[in-house]
Structure formats: structure tokens, C-alpha cells
């Protein structure tokens, strides 16, 4: 097999069909079920987008009401899971807590190996209801704060912000603008074709393993800094720079050292990430309300240097990092926020994989030593 036949990282390999989303790098655009993501961000709730991803069409008023009622009915945590979360060390990464929680939830699945789409979607409902509770609990237990119960009258974004930050005066959970900007990020992070975590979920599903195992594997993939973990590294970089006036110099020196700077470049988009303008709009909106112009100036300076020196443009993680920071989230929890959104896309892909399944099993090109015989241990040197 020649080197030209080996596609490292499956770069450019088309492994299957999907009707869920379409990434179009040539036109710098992304659609969910045919709708431009920027159109969905401006005109739909996160719940409407989840429904679209799962069923292929935007819901009617009655369909959305039923969908929301079903989803909110799952907002309760098993006592054993609560105890498990509190037993985990505060030093572990929050993604480890999520991964452990999903694995625990899977032990209660009465029919783990079913390929029934409705059952898989019910698991999706369960995860979309309970994982925000897990993340909120984890945030508050690490800071010694009391756990806040979910509100069954609120949407996913609003309820989550309430569970994390409470509802006192000044809380972002009481600001319609803050809730909407956070919800926009959930829509933008919800789905993105065959990315590493989604492909991991599909690989696991292709073996006919259970949905919880597929989601657990996807969380493991998303934890990596070359995938979902990048938004955390973006903010750590900004905090390290600290002063916007130092950003250009910091970037220049980092590029001179040929360091990888998270938040820039994309495996598919070569002319810019189509989701960035919508997320940047929310980032600037949050900065205006939360005295965050420092981060906007730093963002602009870093972007300017990177594009001038390399031509590489930002990806979604670059504006999302400071946006989440201005909302008040601890940096280590940025990637779990990604999970809360992407569970919707993962669920849609697991259903699609089961509908027309083929075991995913690529070939490899061997480049080790040629075949040889075993030498008795007494004769080895």
C-alpha cells in the first residue's frame, strides 16, 4: 500500500451518508437539516433545534409543547448518582464527572441493546435533562454551595443557568439577554457532522453497543484539547496574557516558537468557521453588559496577528471561551457546556447509524518489521 493511499486522521475520507447536517467549506456555511445555522440561531430556541435534529423538521407549537413536557419530566437525579458525584475528588476534571455519570446512568437502561429510535431519543431526553443537573451540581459542590433544584417551567438554557447561578438579583439567570446568548452557543455547538466525538459515537454504535456507551465514548473524545477541550485552552491563554496591550506581542512570540494556539484553524473550514460570526455577536453582547471590553480588545488583537502572520481564522471555540467566562462559568467547565449541547447531535447520529448500520472497521497499512520466527529465550541477545 502506497503512502498516497493512507489518509492520516481519515482526512478527506467520506465514510458514510448523513442527512443531519451539512458542512460546506467552499461556501463557509453549515446547515442543520437544510436550515442555515445562523438562521436557526436568530429564530429558534435550543429545544426547537433539538427537535429538528431528531425528527428532521422544525416543530409546530403543539409538537414543541409535547416535546418540552416530555424532556422536563426527566429532571430528577437518582440518589445513587448524587452520592457518586459527591464522592468524586474535586481535583478531577469536570469531563471525568460527566463521563462517569453517563456510565452510571447506563446501568439502569432496561433495554440497552435496542435499536428502536424512540428508545434512543428517550435516552437523549434523559441526558439533556439530567446532564445539566450534573454539571450544575458539580460546579456548586466544588465551591461549597448548596445545590439548586431544577425548575420544570423553564427551558434547558434558562433552567441550567438558574441551577448554576441561582436567581438572586443580578444573576445571569434573570437576564433574558444573557439566557439568549447562552442558548445561542448551545445551538451553535449542537451538531457538526462527522467530527471526532460524533464519529466515535457512530463507531461504537456500529458495533450494536448501547447508547450510553456511545455517549460515554463521545465524551471521552470531546475532552481532548484538539476537539472540545479547545475552548478551555482559549480562555487560559487569554487569562495568561491578561492585558490586551500585551496580546499582539504574546501572539507574535508564540508564533515564532511555532506553538499551537487554540481557537484558530479548523480541519474542515479553511476560509473561516461559519459559526464564528453568530458566536462573536453574542460574545460582544455579553461584553457590553458585563464590562468585558478587555476580552473583546484581546480577541481582536489576537485575531489580527494570527490572520496577518498565518492567514488562519478563528473557530467557534475562540469567541465561546470569553463568552462563557463573562457569564461566570469556571474555565474547567467550558467543555462540559459543549457536551450539554452536543448530546442532541450525538443522539441524532446514533439513531441514523442504527437505521442503516454497517460495522465501521477501516484498514491499516502495516509498517513494522517483516515476518520472523521466535528465537528461544535462552538464545536471545
From Swiss-Prot:
Q: Gene3D superfamilies under this entry?
A: Citrate Synthase, domain 1 (1.10.580.10), Cytochrome P450-Terp, domain 2 (1.10.230.10)
Q: Which CDD domains does UniProt cross-reference here?
A: DsCS_like
Mark the transmembrane ranges: none
Catalytic site residues? Answer: 227, 266, 317
| E.C. number | 2.3.3.5, 2.3.3.16
Please write the reaction equations for the catalytic activity of this protein. propanoyl-CoA + oxaloacetate + H2O = (2S,3S)-2-methylcitrate + CoA + H(+); oxaloacetate + acetyl-CoA + H2O = citrate + CoA + H(+)
Which pathway or pathways does this protein act in?
Carbohydrate metabolism; tricarboxylic acid cycle
- PROSITE patterns this protein is in? CITRATE_SYNTHASE (PS00480)
Q: What Gene Ontology molecular function terms does this protein carry?
A: 2-methylcitrate synthase activity; citrate (Si)-synthase activity; citrate synthase activity
Induction is noted as: By propionate.
Gene Ontology annotations of biological process type: carbohydrate metabolic process; tricarboxylic acid cycle
Against Pfam families, the record matches this protein to: Citrate_synt
Q: How does it assemble?
A: Homodimer.
* Record function comment: Catalyzes the Claisen condensation of propionyl-CoA and oxaloacetate (OAA) to yield 2-methylcitrate (2-MC) and CoA. Also catalyzes the condensation of oxaloacetate with propionyl-CoA but with a lower specificity.
Listed name of the protein: 2-methylcitrate synthase 1
Species of the source: Corynebacterium glutamicum (strain ATCC 13032 / DSM 20300 / JCM 1318 / BCRC 11384 / CCUG 27702 / LMG 3730 / NBRC 12168 / NCIMB 10025 / NRRL B-2784 / 534)
Name the gene.
prpC1
